[in-house]
A protein has these predicted regions:
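Acidic/His- and Gly-rich active-site-bordering loop/insert found
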Residues: 1-46, 67-72
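Residue-level signal for beta-strand positions within conserved beta-sheet cores that form or flank
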Residues: 32, 72-74, 121, 165
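Residues at alpha-helix caps and immediate loop-helix transition turns in enzyme cores, especially N-
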Residues: 54, 90-91
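Alpha-helical metal-binding/catalytic segments enriched in His/Glu/Asp
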Residues: 16, 37-85, 124-129, 148-157
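Midchain, well-structured core segments that form catalytic/ion-binding scaffolds
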Residues: 85, 91-171
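Acidic, glycine-rich active-site loops and adjacent beta-strand->loop/helix elements
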Residues: 20-22, 76-87, 107-112
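Active-site-proximal flexible loops/turns
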Residues: 26-28, 57, 88, 115
Length: 171
């Protein structure tokens, strides 16, 4: 975790927090997802909305306060995390080594304002082999991202399987 500071008169600090890490890029990109580009007036690249754009916003806010606000009553810190997408151990490390701010705001969401995280659940589902017909099963590239596709390789008689949209049967 890194940070940028503006001094203030009080020892009581306020902060913003954003993150610079991203989930894996997934499928469907028509250009390198890690190269920022402009298309039709929009910035495109992995993590622009979550959360590099808000990170830049916080740094510009500090620059604005430095240039336009005059002396600040409270010091302001822009925290830039690098571990939000997995377990936020960087924040735990920060809190163990630095005094946490009395107020911390994150612009990591769309309007209207939200005041909480949806929570997370992570599990490994393990089953004994029931009949040996499932040879492989995959879905997604990261535990914390909704997969855009899934696949299963099964052993079965082709004639016994019904045709269905979105399912490819191969012999």
């Amino acid at each position: 975790i890194g940070y940028a500071d503006l001094p203030g008169a009080s020892p009581t600090q306020i902060a913003t927090i954003t993150h610079l890490d991203v989930v894996p890029e997934g499928n469907g990109w028509d250009a390198d997802p890690f190269t920022l580009r402009v298309r039709d007036g929009w910035l495109l690249g992995r993590g622009v909305a979550d959360d590099k754009g808000p990170s830049v916003l916080c740094l510009y806010a500090l620059k604005f306060l430095k240039d336009e606000a005059g002396p600040l009553r409270y010091p302001v810190r822009a925290l830039l995390g690098c571990n939000e997408e997995t377990n936020m151990k960087d924040v735990a490390w920060y809190n163990a080594h630095e005094k946490p701010p009395v107020f911390c705001f994150t612009p990591d969401a769309e309007f209207p304002l939200c005041n909480g995280e949806k929570g997370q659940f992570e599990a490994d589902l393990i089953s004994p082999v029931l009949n040996g017909d499932i040879l492989d099963f995959e879905g997604g590239v990261a535990r914390n991202a909704v997969p855009d596709r899934a696949s299963a390789l099964i052993r079965a008689e082709l004639a016994a399987l019904p045709a269905a949209e979105g399912i490819t049967l191969e012999q």
